[in-house]
Amino acid sequence: MKKLTVLACMCLSFSFSQIINAQEDQESTFDKIWDNVVLYENVENSLMSKFWLTGRLQGEYHSFENEVAPAIDHDDYDWRRFRFGFKATLFGDITLHSEADLGLENRGRPLYNDLTDTYISWSTENGMKFKLGKQSAPFTLDGSTSSKKLHTLERSKIAGNIWFGQEYFPGISVSGSKDEIDYFAGFYSNDNKPEFDGAFKHGQFGILSVGKDYAGNFDLEKSYLRLDFMFQEDDGNDDVEDFNDWNAAYSFVTKWENNDWYFWTDLSFADRKNGDVWGLQLMPFYDITDKTQVIFCYTHLDSSGDNQLRGSRWEDRLDRGEYRGDDLTEYFFGLNHFFYGHKLKWQNGLQYTQLDEADGSKEYEGWGFTTAFRISW
């Protein structure tokens, strides 16, 4: 524990020492570098007016420990995500996007894992957007946030317990805004196949979201409130055993912002076949400068079923295997530095997690630290 705390303090102190105000020529350099992903652009070409590369590369060092006897700890460097693909604008208003998840840690296995975003989309004149294909299914605060734009190192434990652990599903969605009310509706296959061969063979689910910014009512820059609804049906196929425990889930998301202060929340509930789950996430953060940000996040989940809550990615990967309980609490402290917005950033996080089993005994209690670079294009 002492080594972990010292390491965290050293890294956080070092990151504070690197805080600088970016100059205009630095921004210009970043602009020139990122402009290189556009391989073709010609607005007069009615067939294909633009073609550019997309992707993300996320590397990190993490150190986690479980103090519950027998105590165990683990630290390692890891390529968290590597995705690569393209986007093309066709026939003026149609977008074709395809991206693959590639495993740089796939030792002895193929580099290719699966497709993530692979869809076509188009918009009407009034701003209604349709999307068909494999796409992100947005639900809960962090579940509706791209991994490129997370303010924490990982999605919250609400996203992993109230919502599916998987993000991309084959389906169709429509989104837009009407009379200042944002809306989203999606219908998806709940399969976990790498491409499209399992689409709608095991079951399906739907998502409906409505949101509105009430900034004028509260005299703030942003006061956004959103309700998410998810309903699912499946045939109990073992191929989708990660998802067939859900009947429905609901989420109330708020985003309060003013000047350099932010306060985002998520209150969620899942109707699961083996016990209901509710969760609360409170996430205030503050911009120290236009490039540097401090963040705190409190998350708590409680389950009426025995031992169906799970820890995060690295907590679960300690040598003793997966940890399960029915009462889960996490405190997260973070420091982010944005060199080029979310496209190039350095993130640091220190977290404390406690997971209790149904009988009251501790399943997991310990600290974790992660420092990471996130690049996207």
Predicted regions and their residues:
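Outer-membrane beta-barrel pore domains
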Residues: E24-F30, E65-I72, G108-P110, Y119-S123, ...
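Outer membrane beta-barrel
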Residues: L39-N192, H202-I207, G211-G216, F229, ...
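Bacterial N-terminal signal peptides
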Residues: A8-S15
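N-terminal periplasmic/intermembrane-space "pro-region" immediately following the signal or transit peptide
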Residues: Q18-Q58, W377
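Generic detector of N-terminal low-structure segments
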Residues: F16-Q18, Q281
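Inter-helical turn/loop segments and adjacent helix faces that build the functional surface
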Residues: P194-G198
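Short, well-ordered amphipathic alpha-helices
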Residues: D35-L39, G206-Y214, F332-N336, A372-I375
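Positively charged n-region of N-terminal signal peptides that target proteins for export
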Residues: M1-L4
